[in-house]
């Protein structure tokens, strides 16, 4: 009998509705889009909402989190909420691997979400030549595969963000990481800029929601709405 997976609400109503009730536990959700499209804002809000529900959040930060932005979204209880967000700040792809492995020990401590923002920031720097590219792709797949296994074993929400590249053939932006990363991610959401503060989220891949379905949301002073 198929069990109903728990979902984590982001408090961005259009996005939660797009995903059929929130971010699903037990799988990896990938969010990709160009710089400034709202990836980190969504991740911060997810971590904050997770803590508000009485659980801890793990946040692997490779982009450089803004403490001011966190305070804006978390509001007057920012200091208290921050106590239940475990932050890793790797400075290389190798350190990112160590942080990912470390989540297994910590995830037993009432953790509701693991976030990697971004999973591919250091990965891009490792793509020097063909041999190292193959090795690095395999390593990225291993990292995200490890998180997928952990998500299933502990029934945790796992969210990774991904950067994009310009695909000349299709004249469109595509996520970095190749087919293996796409395969491991059971839900994939693309974010697009549509105006000042206005964004569109589109489902690229989902187990129960139609691909190509979109929603509009706004980045405001106190989060994504």
Swiss-Prot record:
Domain of life the protein comes from: Archaea
Cleaved signal peptide residues: none
Keyword list, A-Z: ATP-binding, DNA damage, DNA recombination, DNA-binding, Nucleotide-binding
InterPro entries: AAA+_ATPase, DNA_recomb/repair_Rad51_C, DNA_repair_and_recomb_RadB, P-loop_NTPase, RecA_ATP-bd
GO molecular function: ATP binding; ATP hydrolysis activity; ATP-dependent DNA damage sensor activity; damaged DNA binding
Family matches, as SMART domains: AAA
BP GO annotations: DNA recombination; DNA repair
HAMAP family: RadB (MF_00350)
Family under the similarity heading: Belongs to the eukaryotic RecA-like protein family. RadB subfamily.
Function summary: Involved in DNA repair and in homologous recombination. May regulate the cleavage reactions of the branch-structured DNA. Has a very weak ATPase activity that is not stimulated by DNA. Binds DNA but does not promote DNA strands exchange.
Protein name: DNA repair and recombination protein RadB
């Amino acid at each position: 009998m198929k069990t109903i997976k728990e979902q984590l609400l982001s408090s961005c109503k259009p996005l939660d509705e797009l995903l059929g009730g929130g971010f699903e536990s037990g799988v990896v959700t990938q969010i990709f889009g160009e710089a400034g499209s709202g990836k980190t804002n969504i991740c911060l809000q997810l971590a904050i909402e997770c803590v508000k529900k009485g659980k801890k959040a793990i946040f692997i930060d490779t982009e450089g989190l803004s403490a001011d932005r966190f305070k804006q979204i978390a509001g007057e209880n920012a200091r208290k909420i921050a106590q239940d967000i475990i932050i890793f700040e790797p400075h290389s792809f190798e350190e990112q691997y160590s942080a990912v492995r470390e989540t297994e020990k910590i995830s037993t401590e009432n953790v509701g979400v693991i976030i990697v923002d971004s999973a591919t920031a250091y990965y891009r720097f490792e793509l020097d030549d063909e041999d190292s590219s193959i090795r690095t792709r395999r390593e990225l797949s291993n990292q995200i595969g490890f998180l997928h296994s952990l998500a299933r074993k502990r029934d945790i929400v796992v969210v990774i963000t991904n950067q994009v590249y310009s695909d000349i053939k299709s004249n469109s932006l595509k996520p970095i990481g190749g087919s293996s990363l796409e395969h491991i991610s059971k839900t994939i959401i693309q974010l697009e800029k549509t105006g000042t503060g206005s964004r569109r989220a589109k489902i690229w891949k989902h187990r129960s929601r139609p691909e190509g379905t979109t929603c509009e949301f706004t980045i405001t002073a106190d989060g994504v709405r």
